[in-house]
Amino acid sequence: MFTSPYRSKNFDSLQAAAQQFPRLFAPRSERSHKGTYGTLAVVGGAEGMSGAVILAATAAMYGGCGKVWAGFNQAELPFAVIAARPEIMLATAAQLQARSDVSAWVCGCGLGLGESSLRVLQNQLTLAHERA
């Protein structure tokens, strides 16, 4: 249930989505596995902002994505941050951008404003153009 300060504006967004997109909420086959439901890459997480990528990746898992990668714009991966979410796979942003098996991308969650963040974004936009 999502709410607003105005009681008349509250709505159950999942129920609304189920009505608008019934295929997304159909029961999954017993013979399926996480690879059946696509691979999402969430790129961002500059130093000190790892939580943004983890939150987005966690939301993707709850939303039904199959495999979810979290790509961090940091020299060292924040393994401690991800300890509670072992189902989310880790990589640096550069490692993740080199993968060819990603079905969809999310870029910018906690990416920051530094030069390395700009390079990550430029690389991501180039990849999107090349793979379109």
Region spans (language model):
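Small-residue (G/A/S/T)-rich helix-start motifs and N-terminal tracts that mark the onset
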Residues: 1-132
